[in-house]
């Protein structure tokens, strides 16, 4: 019998899943939902929020890294249009990550201080996936690998990305193969070092912007990369402000100076020439 304010189950809905792959099995929900283990004693109500916030961030970072590596592979094979698809997806994930800070911002200083001491030296600064994304976007910093010496898998991943070309490196190399004038010094540079502003690249991008109709996919890629960097900065800023409203000017659990350290990250750039060209157009 169907009562009011209810929806009857359709006859073809699968009811017996004993021999079928179920939703929970496919997503490994038994493991996923058993991965939240508060360390506070007695267990603090808000620690679950804190854990889930960071775990979901790590899941999204995993997807971003997956998409950026694929985009880089496409660029290396001169497949610009498929790479644009990956970059577009990354941008949407970035929007989700930035907005997600509003959930953690519901944690007040008075609530957080009640379990912060149980976190020891663990810190979001130690997120190897976040560092991996910075590396693949060109923010190379070999010193950062020291933080992951205890984790063989993470250290190997980051060391590999440190020595590999960034997404930006591969994009500029693609432009070179298409006949655009790229400085030899850029093509031959040590990709394990951070990319710094190269004024000789600006005329290249100016030419693309001023002949957009003839270079539409390259023009679109330039704008996608600017969007990506801008979104990254939005995320960094929301991170900074969430930390500031939660712990003020206290030092981070990982030993950093906290807010002032995060503020300096706002000065880091991935694609400085794509911003500089705007002054020249």
Curated annotation (Swiss-Prot):
It catalyses: L-tryptophan + O2 = N-formyl-L-kynurenine. Its EC number is 1.13.11.11. One of its GO terms (molecular function) is metal ion binding. The gene is kynA. Its cofactor is heme. One of its GO terms (biological process) is L-tryptophan catabolic process to kynurenine. Heme-dependent dioxygenase that catalyzes the oxidative cleavage of the L-tryptophan (L-Trp) pyrrole ring and converts L-tryptophan to N-formyl-L-kynurenine. Catalyzes the oxidative cleavage of the indole moiety. This is Tryptophan 2,3-dioxygenase. InterPro entries: Trp/Indoleamine_2_3_dOase-like, Trp_2_3_dOase. Belongs to the tryptophan 2,3-dioxygenase family. Pathway: Amino-acid degradation; L-tryptophan degradation via kynurenine pathway; L-kynurenine from L-tryptophan: step 1/2. It comes from the Bacteria.
